[in-house]
């Protein structure tokens, strides 16, 4: 078996990626999220496939088909809620994965980091389109509001919006194409994940110390496969607890009302995992400015390798930078809360202050702190 594992052209690739992969001996549980995201992606593709077998992408029957899945299909309710809450799980894991990358300076592996940003954008696009498919009130109005943002693009904006809609409003054509994109994007994500891993295995993994670990590596299997299984159990337990006890905890009650173009919901808001970006979008009174801030809130991640001015890679031994990162985390929690609140005083002001401090922390305070720490350490 060993011979085949190391000689067979296809099995050899799997062997070098998951079995004999030289891995730093000191990586912590923070390095489990990559494998958890892989499992989550597989689960989303499988549950999505089974949902697609019963779903109809037509404005007149989409809502009813989702109801039919929940009521009449064997374990349809389970598949539907696993898929919906699996998306929430996916984003929790992604945000933790990115947070770990920032804390331990993994963004210095710039190719892996940039592919990761592309992955984040692809996952966000997929989740947004998936939210439109049940054709509830929030699906319809969410699609209308978010696609309408493109009209802020000078000159070509309005034409672009109508082109995406496939008409003069969000309708059957929009739903059909969103379903098509929602189906194809996960497979593009799988290809990007493979590229992400390819670049990662070119350089080798980072580790909590931020130092070169070439002199102290161990095989991935059995040490980290066992460790990953523990992560799978934790994730599986959390997800099942959510699905079986409170499946609608993270959803919006408005989405249990069929889409009605003549009736606007009192508060249009996206799913919880987009609320921080939505709060940044809303905190700028100008439409184009808001759209640019929305994009910047995600694309600012691409600047991390450039803004890294510290002589140390990791934040493990940099207490001031460490505090700043936790302040940034708290700031994101505040933005998430504000994104779900109505546009009125004092929420508008809190949102604007949180948006300013978000960009200020990343673009100004973190690089300055890095330079200051270098001075303290006489580097």
UniProtKB/Swiss-Prot annotation:
InterPro entries according to UniProt: Cyt_b/b6_C (IPR005798), Cyt_b/b6_C_sf (IPR036150), Cyt_b/b6_N (IPR005797), Cytb/b6-like_sf (IPR027387), Cytochrome_b (IPR030689), Cytochrome_b_C_euk/bac (IPR048260), Cytochrome_b_N_euk/bac (IPR048259), Di-haem_cyt_TM (IPR016174)
Essential cofactor(s): heme b
The record's free-text note on cofactor binding: Binds 2 heme b groups non-covalently.
The keyword Transmembrane helix belongs to this UniProt entry's keyword annotation: yes
Protein function: Component of the ubiquinol-cytochrome c reductase complex (complex III or cytochrome b-c1 complex) that is part of the mitochondrial respiratory chain. The b-c1 complex mediates electron transfer from ubiquinol to cytochrome c. Contributes to the generation of a proton gradient across the mitochondrial membrane that is then used for ATP synthesis.
Record's subunit section: The cytochrome bc1 complex contains 11 subunits: 3 respiratory subunits (MT-CYB, CYC1 and UQCRFS1), 2 core proteins (UQCRC1 and UQCRC2) and 6 low-molecular weight proteins (UQCRH/QCR6, UQCRB/QCR7, UQCRQ/QCR8, UQCR10/QCR9, UQCR11/QCR10 and a cleavage product of UQCRFS1). This cytochrome bc1 complex then forms a dimer.
Protein name per its UniProtKB record: Cytochrome b
Native source organism of the sequence: Myoprocta pratti (Green acouchi)
Gene it is expressed from: MT-CYB
